[in-house]
Amino acid sequence: MRSLAVVVAVVATVAMAIGTARGSVSSIVSRAQFDRMLLHRNDGACQAKGFYTYDAFVAAAAAFPGFGTTGSADAQKREVAAFLAQTSHETTGGWATAPDGAFAWGYCFKQERGASSDYCTPSAQWPCAPGKRYYGRGPIQLSHNYNYGPAGRAIGVDLLANPDLVATDATVGFKTAIWFWMTAQPPKPSSHAVIAGQWSPSGADRAAGRVPGFGVITNIINGGIECGHGQDSRVADRIGFYKRYCDILGVGYGNNLDCYSQRPFA
């Protein structure tokens, strides 16, 4: 990944919603709001110009019951805001003095720039296909064969043989990102479980400062690099996207937005 190496060492099942799941993400975020959030994604300077569409997002979300449809209206809005914020950080083309602000430039990239590795780890379960490279692609910048394999199995596509689909088919790209979001990586909970209020931190979690909120989602995604050492500009960037998107959706941010004092998950 560009700023993140997602490492999923344990293949987990998709975390399905507990309780009431209803409707569609289209009832939570409209096309106009989506376009406002990702204001410059189709700018001529963006590598991903024309790739990430609202229709692809809605279609991908429909494949994961519970995503953006669990709990209260506010909980649903926060989940969509959190997902788009985290993935916006992974694909950002923004800078401090960018037009409309740094947080209007999410989804500018669809694949890792200047990848120097094939991200292939020898695996009997998820063997690399000859000549294929598993660098960061899509909204979450999915990396490594041991992520492409289980993600592909979950969505019914052979991504080990066809990793480029994550960056050439927007619905596939969104599906891999939502798969990652919905899937627990023990001892990490799923990001969905956290934002939907389904995760109860253990004593060890609390001792490590890991409590429910947007901050622990950053810890799940890239805690080993960004969390537990005080102020970090990457964490602040994620929070900036999240606050902007919550404001657009008209929902409060909740508590515990950063992971500055959280120890990373083991």
Swiss-Prot record:
It comes from the Eukaryota. GO terms for molecular function: endochitinase activity. It catalyses: Random endo-hydrolysis of N-acetyl-beta-D-glucosaminide (1->4)-beta-linkages in chitin and chitodextrins. CDD domains: chitinase_GH19. The keyword Oxidoreductase does not apply. Its EC number is 3.2.1.14. One of its GO terms (biological process) is polysaccharide catabolic process. It is an enzyme of class 3 (hydrolase). InterPro entries: Glyco_hydro_19 (IPR016283), Glyco_hydro_19_cat (IPR000726), Lysozyme-like_dom_sf (IPR023346). Keywords: Carbohydrate metabolism, Chitin degradation, Disulfide bond, Glycosidase, Hydrolase, Plant defense, Polysaccharide degradation, Signal. Coiled coil: none annotated. The active site is at residue 90. Residues 1-23 form the signal peptide. PROSITE patterns: CHITINASE_19_1, CHITINASE_19_2. Disulfide bonds join 46-108, 120-128, 227-259. It holds the Pfam family Glyco_hydro_19. Defense against chitin-containing fungal pathogens. Belongs to the glycosyl hydrolase 19 family. Chitinase class II subfamily. This is 26 kDa endochitinase 2. It comes from Hordeum vulgare.
